[in-house]
Structure formats: structure tokens, C-alpha cells
Amino acid sequence: MNRVILFVSFLLIIWFFIPIYEKPRVLKNVLSEDECKHIQDTASKKLQTSTVSKNRDIDESIRKSETAWLKASEDPVVDKLIRKCVSMTDRPLRNCEDLQVLKYKPGGFYKPHQDAFPEDKNRRMYTFIFALNDEYEGGETEFPNIKKSYRLEKGDALFFNTLNNYECI
């Protein structure tokens, strides 16, 4: 069994098309210990080198991490999490993407970016970032334009508007 999982940052991202809120906000204890472990275990079997841009390019000067996509239709825990997130919004389930699980090893990063492509008519409007563990160094989500950074504890979520040009780090 790969024990490096205990020393890396796992973040789970879900995107929704939902109404605009002012600032990023932390939602405490959204995921249980068991849900965090289940998502880590399930994702670890599907991880691939993360890509950037709509062309799915691999560019480790911009992003160095691994990504797994989890479908609600294939896993009841994932389905429950998506429904929990939808319940915190006024948007329908059909507007939700699959879960994107990111694994950052020591030295991993994602340079400032937006979670939406401006030319897309079906742009992501909001992002939920979940911390699946808290045994890591670094790993803050930074918003340079508002001079704020967030470090989540296991089970917490960070919820923000992707269209506000925060340029997350």
C-alpha cells in the first residue's frame, strides 16, 4: 500500500452553476472522516497526471499534480456528496460536474488560474474545494486579488465564485 497518501494534500473540487456570492467562504465539517478516506481510496486507483487548458495539455511549469474524476453514478458516497453540495445551492443536480480529486505531492502546485474559460458559454460559476486530509505542508488556496488565503482542515470545504477573477493559487 502506498503510504505517501498520508503526506500529501488531497483536494476535491466540484463545480456548479449557481448564483453569485461575494467572498470565498469556508464550510466546516462537510465531509466525515469515512467519506474523506473513501474518496481518497477510490481516487487513488484512477489518478493521472493533471492537465491544463481545454486541450488537456500536460504542462508541469503551470501545474504539477495528479487528477482523478469520480462519477456519482458509479459510487454512492460520491452521489451523496454531490447531492449534499447541491442542497447548499439553489441549482439543480444536472448542473453539477463529476468530482475532480487532486493529489499534490511535496513540491506540487497549480499557478494562479481561473476555474472557468471565458469563451465557454457553459462556464463554471462556482467551485467547492474539499480537504480530504490535513497532514500536509503548504496547500493553501490563495486569492491574490483579494489578498486572502485559506488552509482547510480535513472535511472542510471552500466555496467561491469562479467568475470573480480571483486567480486562485
Set out the residue ranges of the language-model regions.
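Fe(II)/2-oxoglutarate oxygenase catalytic core
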Residues: 1-159, 163-169
